[in-house]
């Protein structure tokens, strides 16, 4: 099976694959050049999803749910604190999600060490709407009702891929761990309640450069 160039989308300067992460194939130089001729800075091409040997770049996949008692003590503490502080919920309406999520997305983008220009609200909504079977999550601080963390997931028949995860900067260093709580709730929902076989939750390389939470790895 070969990729079609229509399977790629331009996202913040990078061409990224839109299909299931386990179906992406290696692009030829000609295909990569054809994409770059349409704009963008680089092509992200992740192939050999389940190769036999260890490489310097790998996807993080979770295939079972660990309830709180099964986790390390330090992780249990962060999740319990998060669940006491925030309400985590799946939002069925895209317009409602965008109203809650866009301020979180914008502030998170502006807070990156390598400055990134946030998309407009309209473009953010269009990007969310373009996701195949997209599902939307928000974590809201109970005391104030303020959105603290958001996620957009792309759901397939037997797997779920996390494609967006953003946390409002002011909630990242107040010891309430909104991201850990949201991840825990999503893992419970998809792996235990929905019964998907696996969640694909990002990539990591030997350079340790990743936005994946410590909780996910450990």
Residue ranges and their predicted role:
Residues 52-56, 206-218:
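Conserved active-site alpha-helix within GNAT-family acetyltransferase domains
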Residues 39-47, 191-204:
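Conserved GNAT acetyl-CoA-binding A-motif
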Residues 1-10, 45-52, 61-175, 189-191:
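A conserved beta-strand-loop-helix scaffold within acyl/acetyltransferase catalytic domains
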Residues 1-48:
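N-terminal accessory interaction module
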Residues 23-26, 96, 203-209:
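Acidic-and-aromatic substrate-binding clefts and catalytic sites of carbohydrate-active enzymes
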Residues 32-36, 183-192:
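A conserved short alpha-helix in the GNAT/GCN5 acetyltransferase fold that borders
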Residues 173-185:
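Conserved acetyl-CoA pyrophosphate-binding loop and the N-cap/start of the following alpha-helix
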